[in-house]
Amino acid sequence: MDLNWGVNNMSEIYQSGLYKMVDKRIKTSCNELSDKSFGEIFQIPKGMNYGERRRDLFKSLVLQTLFRPRDLINLLKTLQKEINKSGTFNEHVYKETSKKYSNWLVNNEIANEINPVLRDDYKYVIELLRLCGARDLSVKSFTERYNSVKHEFRLSPLDLLEFLYNVGIIENTWKGKGGKYMHRSIFRNEGDFDRNLQLRIIPAVWNGLMV
């Protein structure tokens, strides 16, 4: 049986399986927090700027993951270690946590998943992803960057995009009603890759590529 951990709409994060998992783990691990609300536990220090306007801390943490339990648990453990090491929670701790987690996600977790498939292509795919940058781009723009890499890939541009989407490295993105950007990924909503939409490297993966 496959459990669905996806979160189609971030406004529903507090009804999700990820939220329930973390809430239960905190309450069973820390008796002193059993009477505190989830919002109190994840409260941001007043005046702290961590680059996420109008978004609460838990949502920001979830968006750094591939919406898989092991990703979120590892991120929270990393955050806990950094807080214990510094004795406080501030912008520096948040950034250091994000840096270490993203490095683990890309260079350990994802690398172990894609290396057996990509083999000799692996380092060139990493080069290609860095050429793509953090912004949205079309399949045509991706193909142009693909062709600029001095290497003969085993997968065609579209096949490579399908592969990268299915392992959670890229996601589809488009403007919805009112100009709001929408995102769809294999782990978040289980939607298929749409070549007619724009795409982008998932932020957590991009951060890991830059470490």
Q: Residue spans of the language-model regions?
A:
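The catalytic "switch" region of P-loop NTPases
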Residues: 1-49
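Winged-helix-like regulatory helical subdomains adjacent to P-loop NTPase cores
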Residues: 54, 63-154
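A long, hydrophobic alpha-helical segment
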Residues: 40-64
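Short amphipathic alpha-helical interaction segments
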Residues: 150-167, 172
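Short, Lys/Arg-rich nucleic-acid/phosphate-binding segment
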Residues: 174-180
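C-terminal accessory extensions appended to soluble enzyme cores
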Residues: 118-122, 164, 181
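Short, amphipathic alpha-helical interaction segments positioned at domain boundaries
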Residues: 184-211
